[in-house]
Amino acid sequence: MTRGPIFLNVGISYGLPRTKLPAAVSFRKWVAATLQGRIRKADLAIRIVDEKEGRALNYHYRNKDYATNVLSFPAQLPEPFPKALKIPLLGDIVMCAPVIAREATEQGKSLSAHYAHLTVHGTLHLLGWNHEDHQEADAMEQLEREILANLGISDPYLGEY
């Protein structure tokens, strides 16, 4: 098993006041737990947005006219990218704070646990995981459960059917 990451750069930016948002160190911990044993170097950005920005991004990139909880944008480096200059850029994660807060309340979850789950979920998308069909969804959800359990966070899918 690969130990790591040995290099982790997670940039956090906020498109709204930081009230009731997890600290940057929490996001870094959740990303590191997701990458543990999978990748040793990573550079990614997380942006926390309001509903207006979240809706605009979801519409622009997915043609869906509503704000969603998390969007992931894997890095697309031009080919061929010189090996000597190659950076371990995974991509960007956008999280919509009002949607996440609303979901946490509706689902009876702590806000921190819900952010942790969606950070893990978004990071897995950057690593190539998807949930386009039941088999992919089951595999991704199981991995999310394992990562969150290692963080001391209970199964986010309990009670769903």
UniProtKB/Swiss-Prot annotation:
Highest taxon in the source lineage: Bacteria
EC numbers on record: 3.1.-.-
This entry carries the following GO cellular component terms, namely: cytoplasm
Matching InterPro entries, A to Z?
MetalPrtase_cat_dom_sf_prd, YbeY, YbeY_CS
Record's keyword annotation contains Isomerase: no
Describe the task this protein carries out. Single strand-specific metallo-endoribonuclease involved in late-stage 70S ribosome quality control and in maturation of the 3' terminus of the 16S rRNA.
Q: What is this protein's record name?
A: Endoribonuclease YbeY
